[in-house]
Amino acid sequence: MQLYLAAEAAETPDVDPRLRLVCVDYRFDRSFPQGLPQAPEGVMLLGGDLSARRVGEIGEECARRGLRAVLAGFGHSPALETARFCDGLLRRGLRPILTENAWQAGCGAEMMISSALSGGDLRTRLEEALGRCDGLCLDLERLRRSFPLPCPDGEGEALSARALADLLHRGAKPSFSEELMCKAFTAEIKGETRFVLFDDRETLRRKLRLAASLGVRRGFLLYPEWSAEDAAAAADA
């Protein structure tokens, strides 16, 4: 499985040669960034509302930089526009990758889904997704959330890295969830008992091993949510 580290051009870190860098500065509603280096076999990540009108320009930029795939679907993605977008990329020899919300059957795109779950079973989720799409990619979103008990909606609240570190320093005893493939513990937060889920390098490696065993093709990590050192450690999985 190929790993990608997505970062802004202005803060691009030095990375392990086994990883490929992805620039997050491309957007459908803006001029494309200038002067970015060659990225053979790389991926263009496009933010904003999906539009098929820029497929020609996308093809030219991908040819210039050696990119082979385009990841999109982070904003509004109408079904007809998405189908035209994917068709335009495929006709230019580019592989479309769409987020789960934008993906549709028959579009010829790989689907990207998040590895961060607060319920269910990650293996089952990956297996079901693989049965629906033309190829699966994993958004290795770093899970770091706390949940009230009970929590019917499963949403919870985001925890900062510092807040999580403080909870662990206070003596929390995390356990590993085989279903969610993350670590978990209960803690008192502002006088309330809450359930905490989080990822670290160990859970990242476990998720990658599971995904690779099922045939997932690509995994994307966001910098600085994951450091270059985290990404290098993940490449050892």
Predicted features and spans:
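Chitinase-like catalytic core of GlcNAc-active glycosidases
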Residues: 1-121
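A structural motif corresponding to the C-terminal end of an alpha-helix
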Residues: 62-65, 89-96, 128-135, 206-217
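Flexible, active-site-proximal loop/turn residues at the rims of small-molecule/cofactor binding pockets
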Residues: 75-77, 142, 225-226
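Short acidic, glycine/proline-enriched helix-loop-strand junctions
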Residues: 79-96, 175-185, 228-237
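Active-site region of glycoside hydrolase catalytic domains
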Residues: 94-96, 105, 124-149
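Active-site proximal loops enriched in glycine and acidic residues that flank catalytic Cys/His/Asp
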Residues: 100, 140, 223
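Glycan-binding loop/region signatures in secreted carbohydrate-active enzymes
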Residues: 135-206
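Acidic/aromatic/glycine-rich contiguous surface patches that form carbohydrate-binding/processing clefts
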Residues: 212-237
